[in-house]
């Protein structure tokens, strides 16, 4: 098979996914790695003449090899998803007539119970942040936004000031067809105003309204820095278990479901593609240990 041509199709597909479907950069990187693994596997098929000869048996063989390499079911499911959307793209563009992945289903797996923060833990995090400094106001706003909006860390860090509607307490995350409106708390609104004023005063001519969360150099806060500051505040708050930016998103999801929010509305707020992903919050609130934590949120 002409693998140079195959790799050309992959590049065209990745370009299409990033700039037409507006998938995130991290998603593109993951898909690229998955398709590179597929290319490597197919290169060992001696009798493969061209791309139209790729069969369901070959795709199943690829998945079997991944299983033998002890790839987890969740990762295996994601890799199959990457392969499926690639071949759908090829079929849509009439490069192939038959999609070899059409009859192949993703493996079922048990959804892990995500970490849910209690109101006590969130209050402890608030209490250890020094809001007398610009960086402290920034960090307090980060905590309030993550907790009350349910956005991802990537969405948080990409925010500019113009996407905020303070009067309606809503903001727009994402771009193009993948954009959505989410809402935030009154606390987040107040810390947004205080932080922006402090940022203007601190950075003066280096102040940039297109980047909300900045470091001491007035450049965009990185994902690594975000994780470090959450780790630092968790340690100061004497929270012994590991938490991450996603802990706030999971807390938001479970909290909304426990208060009767329609699951399809929650799906839209969280930006989930598949309703099954959102349904995990229905499952976790059934667990007694989680219910105990959620009860604290109501106090």
Task: Enumerate the language-model features and the residues they cover.
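Conserved catalytic core of the tyrosine transesterase superfamily
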Residues: 1-299
């Amino acid at each position: 098979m002409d693998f140079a041509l195959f790799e050309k199709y992959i590049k065209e597909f990745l370009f299409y996914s990033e700039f037409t479907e507006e998938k995130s950069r991290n998603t593109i990187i993951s898909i690229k790695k998955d398709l590179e693994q597929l290319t490597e596997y197919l290169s060992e098929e001696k009798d493969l003449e061209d791309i139209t000869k790729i069969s369901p048996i070959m795709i199943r063989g690829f998945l079997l090899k991944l299983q033998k390499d002890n790839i987890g079911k969740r990762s295996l499911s994601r890799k199959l998803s990457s392969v499926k959307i690639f071949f759908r793209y090829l079929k849509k563009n009439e490069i192939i007539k038959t999609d070899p992945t059409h009859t192949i289903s993703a493996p079922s797996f048990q959804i892990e119970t995500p970490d849910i923060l209690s109101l006590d833990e969130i209050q402890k995090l608030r209490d250890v942040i020094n809001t007398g400094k610009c960086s402290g106001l920034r960090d307090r706003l980060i905590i309030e936004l993550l907790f009350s909006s349910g956005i991802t860390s990537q969405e948080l860090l990409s925010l500019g000031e113009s996407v905020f509607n303070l009067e309606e307490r809503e903001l727009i995350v994402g771009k193009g067809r993948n954009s959505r409106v989410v809402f935030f708390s009154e606390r987040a609104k107040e810390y947004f105003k205080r932080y922006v004023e402090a940022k203007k005063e601190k950075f003066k001519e280096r102040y940039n309204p297109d980047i909300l969360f900045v470091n001491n150099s007035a450049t965009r806060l990185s994902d690594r820095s975000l994780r470090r500051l959450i780790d630092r505040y968790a340690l100061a708050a004497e929270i012994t278990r590991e938490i991450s930016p996603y802990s706030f998103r999971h807390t938001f999801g479970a909290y909304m479901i426990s208060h009767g929010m329609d699951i399809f509305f929650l799906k839209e707020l969280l930006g989930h593609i598949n309703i099954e992903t959102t349904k995990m919050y229905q499952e976790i609130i059934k667990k007694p240990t989680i219910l105990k934590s959620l009860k604290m949120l109501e106090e």
